[in-house]
Structure formats: structure tokens, C-alpha cells
């Protein structure tokens, strides 16, 4: 039976991948778990343990071949794949996400943006035209949609998620400050948490 990979491990794989990318660009051919750990500020035993979920990568004494490990991680976390993304809510956050070119560079293609407010329908945001949320069924029939960004007010969030789940969405990046009830993977984004964490570090003089 396949080992269940804990969510925190999956999250860290993305960090490892970015770190390896940088190491590779710096021309570092082999890397020890200690080096990855130091760069990311975590324990090297943690790095070794996380990577061991996916089989034996490194060689004792030599470490990991940077490029090979990067390629293996690409396969595991699906970086080689393009993901189709839609944004629900064409307000401040939704518009910013739909306009963000960096996502496409990371292979997350925003292919649609939807809103319930008719006055926003037809507006151009980046390369996209805002569609009414009632057009979502039709959109799913014509497109493969894997990820949705939820940028609607708190009170609309659950209703939107229920609909997206019914249509077969695979995962959600949620900006609404609410715990969603769903069986699909959700990544909550909370900017206030970053501020709280920063103020905590400042107060305790932590770098
Ligand atoms: N996570 C964070 O760090 C963070 C930061 C700021 C705001 N937020 C949250 O993100 C969400 C969006 O914030 P914003 O500033 O972009 O709000 P906004 O009011 O600018 O935009 C929300 C949009 O959602 C649309 N909408 C409402 N109900 C809808 C529905 N049922 N279907 C489709 N569209 C619908 C509205 O018409 C509006 O255009 C809010 O829940 C807000 O609390 C989160």
C-alpha cells in the first residue's frame, strides 16, 4: 500500500524545489540535506525524512545530485504539468490574481474569471473578460479546469465551493476568511497571518 504523504511534507516539497532551482542556477552540482535545510531554516533530518517518502534519492557522503533531485521533485509535485485555473470574484484580490503574470510562468494558467455582479461582467482583466457566474457550467463543459481561486466575500464562499465541487474542481486556493466544508484540497491564504507572524518576530527580535 502507498504511504500517505502528510500535507506539511507536500508543502515543503515546493520549497525544496525552489531551493534546488536556485542551487542549480548557482552551478552547485551536488547538495547535502544539510545545505537545503540551512537555506530553508529547517532541520536536515526533516529534509531527509521528507524526501524518504519518495524512495532513496541521495548517496551517503555525496548528497543529492541537484539536477536529478530537481527532476524527481518536478514529477512528484507536478511542476512539469500546466494547470488550468479559474478565479471566482473579480474584485480586488481576484483581479490582482488574474493579472499576475508570475503564475503563468509557474505553469498555472488563469483561463477564466467569474463574478456574480452583472456590472463587472464584460470587463477586461489582463487577457480575460469577466464572465457571469451563471456561465460556469458551460465553461466546465468546454474547458478542463483544475484549480479555482476563491476571491469572493465570506458569506458567498461556501455556496461557490459547493457548486465548484459539483462541477469537479480538483483544488481551491481560498482567500475568503472562512473554513470551507469540502472534501477537495484547499489552500487557505491569509495575509493577516503574515503580518501577525512578522510583528511577533519584530517584537522578539527574531530575524
Ligand atoms: N486572504 C487574505 O489575505 C485576504 C486579504 C484581503 C481580502 N481577503 C478576502 O478575499 C475575498 C475577496 O476580497 P476582495 O477585496 O477582492 O473583495 P471585493 O469585494 O473587491 O471582491 C469580491 C467579488 O466577489 C464577487 N462576488 C460576490 N458574491 C459572488 C458569488 N456568489 N459568485 C461570484 N462572485 C461573487 C463580488 O461581486 C466582488 O466583485 C474576501 O472574502 C476578503 O475577505 C482576503
Swiss-Prot record:
Keyword NAD in annotation: yes
Residue spans binding DNA: 15-54
Compartment annotation: Cytoplasm
Key words, A-Z: Cytoplasm, DNA-binding, NAD, Repressor, Transcription, Transcription regulation
Record-annotated membrane-spanning stretches: none
One GO process term, biological-process aspect: response to redox state
Keyword Transcription included in the entry's annotation: yes
Binding site for NAD(+): 89-94
Any one cellular-component term (Gene Ontology): cytoplasm
Coiled-coil features, chain-numbered ranges: none
Superkingdom to which the source organism belongs: Bacteria
Segment forming the signal sequence: none
Annotated InterPro entries: CoA-bd, NAD(P)-bd_dom_sf, Rex_DNA-bd_C_dom, Tscrpt_rep_Rex, WH-like_DNA-bd_sf, WH_DNA-bd_sf
GO terms, molecular function: DNA binding; DNA-binding transcription factor activity
NCBIfam families: PRK05472.1-3 (NF003989), PRK05472.2-2 (NF003993), PRK05472.2-3 (NF003994), PRK05472.2-4 (NF003995), PRK05472.2-5 (NF003996)
Protein family per UniProt: Belongs to the transcriptional regulatory Rex family.
Subunit details: Homodimer.
Role according to the record: Modulates transcription in response to changes in cellular NADH/NAD(+) redox state.
Protein name per its UniProtKB record: Redox-sensing transcriptional repressor Rex
Source species: Thermosipho africanus (strain TCF52B)
Taxonomic lineage: Bacteria, Thermotogati, Thermotogota, Thermotogae, Thermotogales
Amino acid at each position: 500500500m502507498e504511504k500517505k504523504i502528510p500535507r506539511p511534507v507536500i508543502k515543503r516539497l515546493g520549497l525544496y524545489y525552489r531551493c534546488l532551482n536556485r542551487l542549480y542556477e548557482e552551478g552547485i552540482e551536488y547538495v547535502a540535506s544539510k545545505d537545503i535545510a540551512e537555506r530553508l531554516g529547517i532541520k536536515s533530518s526533516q529534509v531527509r525524512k521528507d524526501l524518504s517518502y519518495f524512495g532513496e534519492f541521495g548517496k551517503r557522503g555525496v548528497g543529492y545530485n541537484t539536477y536529478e533531485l530537481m527532476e524527481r521533485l518536478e514529477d512528484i509535485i507536478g511542476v512539469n504539468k500546466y494547470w488550468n485555473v479559474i478565479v471566482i470574484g473579480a474584485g480586488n484580490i481576484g483581479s490582482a490574481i488574474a493579472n499576475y503574470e508570475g503564475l503563468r510562468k509557474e505553469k498555472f494558467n488563469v483561463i477564466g474569471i467569474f463574478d456574480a455582479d452583472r456590472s463587472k461582467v464584460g470587463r477586461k482583466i489582463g487577457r480575460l473578460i469577466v464572465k457571469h457566474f451563471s456561465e460556469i457550467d458551460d465553461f466546465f463543459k468546454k474547458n478542463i479546469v483544475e484549480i479555482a481561486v476563491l476571491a469572493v466575500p465570506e458569506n458567498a464562499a461556501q455556496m461557490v465551493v459547493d457548486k465548484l465541487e459539483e462541477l469537479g474542481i480538483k483544488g481551491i486556493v481560498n482567500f475568503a476568511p472562512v473554513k470551507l466544508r469540502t472534501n477537495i484540497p484547499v489552500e487557505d491564504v491569509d495575509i493577516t497571518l503574515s503580518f501577525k507572524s512578522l510583528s511577533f518576530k519584530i517584537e522578539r527580535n527574531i530575524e
